[in-house]
Amino acid sequence: MSVNRILVINPGSTSTKIGVFDNERPVLEETIRHDVEQIGKYKRIIDQYEFRKETILEVLHSHGINISKLNAVCGRGGLLRPIEGGTYTVNDAMLEDLKNGFSGHHASNLGGILAYEIASGLNIPAFIVDPVVVDEMEPVARISGIAGMERKSIFHALNQKAVARKVAEQLNHKYEDLNLLVTHMGGGITVGAHKKGRVIDVNNGLNGEGPFSPERAGTVPVGQLVEMCFSGEYYRDEMIKKLVGQGGLVSLIGTNDAIKVEQMVEKGDPEATLIYKAMAYQVAKEIGGASAVLHGKIDAIVLTGGLAYSKILVDEIKERVDWIADVIVHPGEDELEALAEGALRVLREEEAPKEYVVREKETVARG
C-alpha cells in the first residue's frame, strides 16, 4: 500500500496542534503554545496566520520533517456557511469567507488558511474536514415555535462523524448504511441523529439547546430566561456567559471539572450526586428524543468525548437508554487523527473531495 504523508493543523486561541501522519500512523504530534503577548499584537485573529505558519514550519524542521515529502495538508474547518459533511478542498471562496469571518471570528478559521498557505507552495492539495457548521438537518427539524427563529446545526461534527465511522467499521458496515445516535460529551454536549451518513437532527450545543454540560446551560425555562434578561440586573454579555461558559456545572456547583464533581459524588455529597444525575438524565432524555427522529430504528447508541471516560456518568445514561439499542462507548476525541483520516479518504479515492461554492448567498456542496 502506498504511503500518503499528511500534515494536519488544528489552531486554538493560544496554541496550534500539528500532526504528521503516514496514512493512519502518527509520525509527529505536537502542541505549539504561543506567547500570549506575541499573538496579542495582532488586531485580528486572521492576521496571525503568517506568524503561525512560520512557527509550524520551524517546528517541522526541528523534528527533521521534510515538507517536500508531504502529499496533502489538512486544517481544522472554521466558521463557514452551513455545508454538508465531508472533506473539502480549500478554494478561493472558502478563503474569502474564512478571512472575512462570514459566520464569526475564531481561531479555527486559521486552519484552512494555514493549510492552503503551506500546501500551495508545495503544489499539493489543502483540505478541511467536517467543520462545526456542518448542516444536514431535514426541513422538519429546522422549525421552531417562533416565526423567523430557525433551529441551527452547530455541533461536534468532526468527532461525531469520525467516531461514527469507527463504530460502523467495528460493526462491519459502512457509515452510510447505519442509523446511529452519537453523543459527544465534553465542555458542551451534542446528540446527533445520524441517518445513513447524514446528521438529520442535532441539538445546538453552542448556545442553549439540549442537555446542560460542564460549561453550558442547555435548554432552560424560556419564560424565566426572558424575565432575567429584562430584570435590569444583567448586561447582554453577562447573560450570554450564563448560557455559555458559566452555565451547567459551573453555575450549579462552581466547577467545570467533571473529575472533581465525580470525587464529590464518590464521597457521598448529596448536591453533587443530584446534579451529576441530572446531567446524565438530560443526556438520556435527549438521546430518547433523537431515537424518535429515526423512528426507533437504531443500530447503536454511541457515547464519546472526554466525559465518556466517566463510568458514573456513562452507567447512569446506559441505565436509561440501553433498551433503545446497544450502547458503544468511545471515550475521548482525537481531532488530529480525524482530520488526517478525512484527507486520507480523498487521497485513496474512497470518496471525492467536495467543493465549497457560494451562489446567491447560499453555499452548495458538490461532490
UniProtKB/Swiss-Prot annotation:
The gene is buk. NCBIfam families: butyr_kinase (TIGR02707), PRK03011.1-5 (NF002834). The keyword Metal-binding does not apply. It catalyses: butanoate + ATP = butanoyl phosphate + ADP. This is Probable butyrate kinase. It is found in: Cytoplasm. One of its GO terms (biological process) is acetate metabolic process. InterPro entries: Aliphatic_acid_kin_short-chain, Aliphatic_acid_kinase_CS, ATPase_NBD, Butyrate_kin. CDD domains: ASKHA_NBD_BK. It comes from the Bacteria.
